[in-house]
Amino acid sequence: MSFTPGKQSSSRASSGNRSGNGILKWADQSDQVRNVQTRGRRAQPKQTATSQQPSGGNVVPYYSWFSGITQFQKGKEFEFVEGQGPPIAPGVPATEAKGYWYRHNRGSFKTADGNQRQLLPRWYFYYLGTGPHAKDQYGTDIDGVYWVASNQADVNTPADIVDRDPSSDEAIPTRFPPGTVLPQGYYIEGSGRSAPNSRSTSRTSSRASSAGSRSRANSGNRTPTSGVTPDMADQIASLVLAKLGKDATKPQQVTKHTAKEVRQKILNKPRQKRSPNKQCTVQQCFGKRGPNQNFGGGEMLKLGTSDPQFPILAELAPTAGAFFFGSRLELAKVQNLSGNPDEPQKDVYELRYNGAIRFDSTLSGFETIMKVLNENLNAYQQQDGMMNMSPKPQRQRGHKNGQGENDNISVAVPKSRVQQNKSRELTAEDISLLKKMDEPYTEDTSEI
């Protein structure tokens, strides 16, 4: 018997027949003579709008049972942990969860500004013995093919899964068993969410790990007569961004104007709702550091929550429930120091709280948390101490090093002996001059 994904029925337990929940589809006389190696292959399917790519890319003339996985970050590998990767579907037992993900290289299109934009690839799943590589054995090294199987599946035999008829069977949204680690930089079509980060895992040499790509999006949701291409949504989004003067592939640059807008937007929020970042620093949000606000120093004051070390500290932050029910709260009315005196005065209250966050050395990242806390608690005291240190004496211009006590004497205008006020002994000439000054003045009437 063969299994049909997405169809529920009673299961039959037998050593010769695989059990499952799918509707049993018994093969007719012509199907029974089909060779095992060719099971699941179409002879030559009719090309439709959903299987043709007008501007480059490889054609996928086979219909997958599941929606695709799309790459949205360049340079990310498409890979799964050993024993994971096959999507789940009602009616298919774990023993049939084996096959491969096929990379569909999509083409490029012209944007409104005349540039060619390459669409990132997409991956689609095919059961073992079906799809474009139905003849290939499990584990064969093929570019654009990534083999996956559950731990209960026998990879030496093809999966007993019927082909999908897009006119009667819709594509099933891709879902995985709990605990599956999805590739980083990819998202499941139709889910609207990016896939969780993947763990790096060693693969056997028979499993080829290739660059991520994607196949046709929701191929089963479109009939063969549909004129809508699977990449039309991406093209429309890119055209809209091009009209707005934005490039979806380039990160948006933050200018002084946008930084000012971001800062003002943050400052317009209540104090307890602000999140400091590069555009709005900790001091701008909450004021200078001091005894009452004693956390933060160095780069963390500049970057705020954008600091790479902040996320691990955020794990210690209490929840709203812990804040209200695990703290000592006190409501106090305070003086309104802000606002225009001409405007009606508002009553201002403070909800003061006192609590504690308890953790021990078994906490994940304990050493890093302690390091960050020690670096930022009361860091303002060290900064204030550095600012209060006496500045290094600067050498005046026009002097050479090593002049010592003469460095404080100006050389622009030399001082006279009177200005210098230097003491010296009187000479005989000085004494004679002083005596003449003491004699009475007499007018000289002698003729020349």
From Swiss-Prot:
PROSITE patterns in alphabetical order: COV_N_CTD, COV_N_NTD
Any GO molecular function: RNA binding
Q: What is the effect of changing residue 33 to F?
A: In strain: Isolate ATCC VR-759 and Isolate clinical OC43-Paris
Q: Does the keyword Transcription feature in the UniProt annotation?
A: yes
Region annotation Disordered: residue ranges?
A: 1-55, 158-231, 266-293, 385-448
Q: Identify the residues that bind RNA.
A: 106, 122, 164
PTM notes:
ADP-ribosylated. The ADP-ribosylation is retained in the virion during infection.
Q: Which GO terms describe its cellular component?
A: host cell endoplasmic reticulum-Golgi intermediate compartment; host cell Golgi apparatus; ribonucleoprotein complex; viral nucleocapsid
| Region spans: RNA-binding | 52-194
Which residue ranges have biased composition labelled Low complexity? 9-22, 193-223
Q: Where in the sequence does UniProt note compositional bias of the Basic and acidic residues kind?
A: 422-439
Q: Which residues fall in a compositionally biased region of kind Basic residues?
A: 266-276
Q: Ranges for the CoV N NTD domain?
A: 61-190
Q: Where in the cell is it found?
A: Virion; Host endoplasmic reticulum-Golgi intermediate compartment; Host Golgi apparatus
PTM-bearing positions, type Phosphothreonine = 174, 427
Summarizing the function annotation, the protein's role is:
Packages the positive strand viral genome RNA into a helical ribonucleocapsid (RNP) and plays a fundamental role during virion assembly through its interactions with the viral genome and membrane protein M. Plays an important role in enhancing the efficiency of subgenomic viral RNA transcription as well as viral replication. Attenuates the stress granules formation by reducing host G3BP1 access to host mRNAs under stress conditions.
Quaternary arrangement and interactors, per the entry? Homooligomer. Both monomeric and oligomeric forms interact with RNA. Interacts with protein M. Interacts with NSP3; this interaction serves to tether the genome to the newly translated replicase-transcriptase complex at a very early stage of infection.
Q: What is this protein called?
A: Nucleoprotein
